[in-house]
Curated annotation (Swiss-Prot):
GO cellular component term of the entry, any: cytosol
Modified residues (Phosphothreonine): T564, T578
Protein name, entry field: Metastasis-associated protein MTA1
Post-translational modifications reported in the UniProt record: Phosphorylation by CSNK1G2/CK1 triggered by estrogen enhances corepression of estrogen receptor (ER). Acetylation is essential for its transcriptional coactivator activity.
Pfam families assigned to the protein according to its UniProt record, in alphabetical order: BAH, ELM2, GATA, MTA_R1, Myb_DNA-binding
Amino acid sequence: MAANMYRVGDYVYFENSSSNPYLIRRIEELNKTANGNVEAKVVCFYRRRDISSTLIALADKHATLSVCYKAGPGADNGEEGEIEEEMENPEMVDLPEKLKHQLRHRELFLSRQLESLPATHIRGKCSVTLLNETESLKSYLEREDFFFYSLVYDPQQKTLLADKGEIRVGNRYQADITDLLKEGEEDGRDQSRLETQVWEAHNPLTDKQIDQFLVVARSVGTFARALDCSSSVRQPSLHMSAAAASRDITLFHAMDTLHKNIYDISKAISALVPQGGPVLCRDEMEEWSASEANLFEEALEKYGKDFTDIQQDFLPWKSLTSIIEYYYMWKTTDRYVQQKRLKAAEAESKLKQVYIPNYNKPNPNQISVNNVKAGVVNGTGAPGQSPGAGRACESCYTTQSYQWYSWGPPNMQCRLCASCWTYWKKYGGLKMPTRLDGERPGPNRSNMSPHGLPARSSGSPKFAMKTRQAFYLHTTKLTRIARRLCREILRPWHAARHPYLPINSAAIKAECTARLPEASQSPLVLKQAVRKPLEAVLRYLETHPRPPKPDPVKSVSSVLSSLTPAKVAPVINNGSPTILGKRSYEQHNGVDGNMKKRLLMPSRGLANHGQARHMGPSRNLLLNGKSYPTKVRLIRGGSLPPVKRRRMNWIDAPDDVFYMATEETRKIRKLLSSSETKRAARRPYKPIALRQSQALPPRPPPPAPVNDEPIVIED
């Protein structure tokens, strides 16, 4: 009963998706809606997986400790030399990788964001605490449903801030404690230099005379406010001016003036009313305008007594000292008393707690025999067996569990056991790092753009193109060994012909581990690569010379001058053939038959397909170039209009390219200058030629000539 009772201030799990981890929230309010349901106003906490990798790197940098220590040689001479180092927490170094991985799941990031969620989505309680530097990190792992935080995340600004002020540690910031003095022993310090006297208790004035002087000081303050224009606007009535003049700042200034004038009342009154006019003393309550006071109350309602955030977001033109001073003066006003009574009345009417029964509905991600398709006969599973059957748990690699849950992308067919599924829902990660972790580095990806036209366009969907999805497989040594040791189980040729069938990687890994000791005794014989001799390569290059370079593109004027009527000739389209053996223009036009016959046929009602055409120098319209002027009209039989010709067929778009640099290519890249690198990027079809001076290291300078003869200086 008590476990299902949730109160204001509890940290709870919320479920917003059946496959995603729970949300961690703190209940601020419990409100009852008009239809009778209960909504919880909660404070959001974010996991590491919810924020960007850049902010995660900043959080890890914040977690490093700054160690300060004294240098040995300088301490003897009375000189303090301090060296600051950044080093990792020694306790984190001692933790194994598995515990480090699980400890990251316990870290949260507090936010100031509030949201309202249905109370029926609560799935349990948890505990969240501020990171305690004196506690052991293992203590957070030993307690169930326990989390910690140290930074504040702003989801709007995408920033991280420290939740508490940092205390500087070291000899430069801490005082040196002296030895305890014996009874009657003096410390030898001059107290007059260390302290400033502001009031004499044994003064010649009586209490009645001091009270009368303070009444005169209040009167002077009221008269000064009547003369001040800004004060008369803020305190339009005499009653308000007298109340403002009776505040502490006026009385403290009067007593300080009396002390400076050696408790002579006549001199003190003369100091309160100098020649320029009466002295006006105002505190923060008078300095702040009504709009600033309303902003402060709004900020206090949102942030509480977090004065740093109040200054940054609401009152950046006010100092932190001014805000704190105004807060304590504001607590003495009637406005504060009224708001306190209203909040108490609202709290009485609101819900204090709510009972949520256990959630017993089955999860849609559960894997059962009834909701899966039968396995393929030629696949790894038997007939009637689920495609994921035989797979180990992606987290703990177990093959036995009373309940399995699908996890990850559907095409991966990954699954988790019951205990790892509960861990995933609560902590937002797996017990062990997996292949789906986003922290692992991947290959650099480059999308090629043909002729400068982007393959993926964010404009009209008519011009948008999408290439076939590419992938990159980077195998490990154990995978390459398993291909040879477990060939009869893996059946690589069969798997290559049927890439959609799953492979039982757990069974292959176990079999490879068992056969590995025997295979080490008889080393594998690798097939040697047969390389042709240099003479054969040279002979081939002589018989197959490089084709000549194309002529440079002529200007439009030369094209106009050379346009002459010619007979009809077949048009050769440079588009690449598609899967069905047709060119891209054939798919656009939808015309079959012989190319020569189509050109001699009548237009058949198709637009821009006239028989008469002018032949000139061959020049294609570039995709990224400028079109011909509007006066020049080039009509080509059996071709497309220029606007339609610029559109690329998605089948003709190139596949993605993965470039894996080697040590040799990295060395060559360092030899190129910045201009040569940019030139090669602009013209990728041209070979890069290295000069001999670039390839060879610079020669050392020649030695200076040595002259054995003495130098004679004549007068």
